[in-house]
C-alpha cells in the first residue's frame, strides 16, 4: 500500500523513529519443539530506517496482540480517546494437522500485518505493537532454515586485501563446483564445474556466499561439493533442568527446549512435556523457593510466580534460571509441612 493511501500522513510518518517496523512478510514456517511441539512463522521485518531482520512468532502471539489492540483501539474501547478499524485476524483452529493449519494461515497473516502497519502512527508506536515486531535476542540467534518465500538476503563484500591473500587458503572453508552456474544478477556468483570456491558465509539452508576467480557473490549450495566446511557453530539449544524423584533416589535430567530463556510456559504444556519425557502420568511438578522448600505447581499463576522469582538468580549459560522438581503425584513427603 502506497504511503499516500495509508491512513497516517506523510509528515507523521517522517517523524517516526528509524527502528519502527513499516512492513513485514512471512518468509517460512518452522517446527519448534519447545514446551510443546508447534510451528512458528518466520517473519522478515523492515524498519523505517531500512534495516531488515527476522523474528519468530506463534499464532497465539498474534492473537494476544490483537486482543490488546481491540481493548485499546477497538470501536468499543473505553480506554483510549482514539479508535480505529483494526484488521481482521484469521480465527483460531482447534482441529487439524498443525503444519497444514500454519501453511493456510500465511496469506491471511501477511494481509493482517500489512494492514496493521498501515494504521495511524499512534498504533505503530503502541508498546505492544513495537514489542511484537522487535527482534529479541532469541530471534537474533536463531538460524533460519529454507526461507522458501524470500530470496536470500545479500550483502556487498569488499575485495580481498593482499594481506588476506597471504593466508593459507587450504585452511579456509571451500567448495568445488559440481555444475556450471550462471548468476542472474551481479549479486550472484557465476562459476564453471571444477572451480574451487572459497566460502565466506552461509546465507541460509540453501544458499552460500563465496569468492572465486576474483569475483564474490551468492550461489545455491546444491551446485557444489563442500571440501572444507565452516567451523561448528556454537550450540544455541536452551535446556531445562529437571530433578526426578523416585523411590530409589533423585536423578537430574536436562531437557532440550526450543524456547526463549525469558519465556513463561503454560502449566498444561509443562505437565505434558514432563509426562512425555519421564513416561509417567501420575506426576506432580514443583519448584524450590528461596527458603529451599518445594512448592507444588497447580496453575499458570503458579508457573508465572516461579519464573518471576527466578529472575536475577545466577544460572548457567543456555539453562533456564528456574528448575522443575518432578515427583509422584501422591508423594507429599518431599514437602516441608512442618509449621
Swiss-Prot record:
Domain of life, source organism: Eukaryota
Main location per the UniProt record: cytoplasm
Membrane-spanning segments: none
Entry keyword annotation includes Protein biosynthesis: no
Residue positions binding a 1,2-diacyl-sn-glycero-3-phospho-(1D-myo-inositol-3-phosphate): 58-60, 92-94
Residues that bear Phosphoserine: 315
SUPFAM superfamilies for the chain: CAD & PB1 domains (SSF54277), PX domain (SSF64268), SH3-domain (SSF50044)
Residue ranges of domain PB1 in the record: 237-329
Localization, UniProt: Cytoplasm, Cytosol; Endosome membrane; Membrane
Residues covered by the SH3 domain: 170-229
Membrane topology label: Peripheral membrane protein
Record keywords, A-Z: Cytoplasm, Endosome, Lipid-binding, Membrane, Phosphoprotein, SH3 domain
Sites bearing Phosphothreonine, chain numbering: 154
Function per UniProt: Subunit of the phagocyte NADPH oxidase complex that mediates the transfer of electrons from cytosolic NADPH to O2 to produce the superoxide anion (O2(-)). In the activated complex, electrons are first transferred from NADPH to flavin adenine dinucleotide (FAD) and subsequently transferred via two heme molecules to molecular oxygen, producing superoxide through an outer-sphere reaction.
Protein name from the UniProt record: Neutrophil cytosol factor 4
Organism, scientific name: Mus musculus
Lineage: Eukaryota, Metazoa, Chordata, Craniata, Vertebrata
Amino acid at each position: 500500500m502506497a504511503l499516500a493511501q495509508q491512513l497516517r500522513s506523510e509528515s507523521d510518518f517522517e517523524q517516526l523513529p528509524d527502528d519502527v517496523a513499516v512492513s513485514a512478510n512471512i518468509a517460512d514456517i518452522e517446527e519448534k519443539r519447545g514446551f510443546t511441539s508447534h510451528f512458528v512463522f518466520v517473519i522478515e521485518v523492515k524498519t523505517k530506517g531500512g534495516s531488515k531482520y527476522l523474528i519468530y512468532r506463534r499464532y497465539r502471539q498474534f492473537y494476544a496482540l490483537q486482543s490488546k489492540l481491540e481493548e485499546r483501539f477497538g470501536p468499543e474501547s473505553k480506554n483510549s480517546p482514539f479508535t480505529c478499524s483494526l484488521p481482521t485476524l484469521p480465527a483460531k483452529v482447534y482441529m487439524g494437522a498443525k503444519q497444514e493449519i500454519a501453511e493456510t494461515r500465511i496469506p491471511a497473516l501477511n494481509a493482517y500485518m500489512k494492514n496493521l502497519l498501515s494504521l495511524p502512527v499512534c498504533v505503530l508506536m503502541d508498546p505492544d505493537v513495537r514489542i511484537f515486531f522487535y527482534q529479541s535476542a532469541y530471534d537474533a540467534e536463531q538460524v533460519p532454515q529454507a526461507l522458501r518465500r524470500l530470496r536470500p538476503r545479500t550483502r556487498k563484500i569488499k575485495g580481498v586485501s593482499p594481506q588476506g591473500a597471504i593466508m593459507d587458503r587450504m585452511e579456509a572453508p571451500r567448495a568445488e563446483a559440481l555444475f556450471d552456474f550462471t548468476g542472474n544478477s551481479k549479486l550472484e556468483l557465476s562459476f564453471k564445474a571444477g572451480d574451487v570456491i572459497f566460502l565466506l558465509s552461509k546465507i541460509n539452508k540453501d544458499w552460500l556466499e563465496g569468492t572465486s576467480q576474483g569475483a564474490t557473490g551468492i550461489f545455491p549450495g546444491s551446485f557444489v561439493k563442500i571440501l572444507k566446511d565452516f567451523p561448528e557453530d556454537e550450540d544455541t539449544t536452551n535446556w531445562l533442568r529437571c530433578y526426578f524423584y523416585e523411590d530409589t533416589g533423585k536423578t537430574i535430567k536436562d531437557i532440550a527446549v526450543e524456547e526463549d530463556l525469558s519465556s513463561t510456559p503454560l502449566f498444561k504444556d509443562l505437565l505434558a512435556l514432563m509426562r512425555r519425557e519421564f513416561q509417567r502420568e501420575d506426576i506432580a511438578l514443583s519448584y524450590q523457593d528461596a527458603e529451599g522448600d518445594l512448592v507444588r505447581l497447580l496453575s499458570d499463576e503458579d508457573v508465572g510466580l516461579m519464573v518471576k522469582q527466578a529472575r536475577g538468580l545466577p544460572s548457567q549459560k543456555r539453562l533456564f534460571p528456574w528448575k522443575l522438581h518432578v515427583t509422584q503425584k501422591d508423594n507429599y513427603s518431599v514437602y516441608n509441612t512442618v509449621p
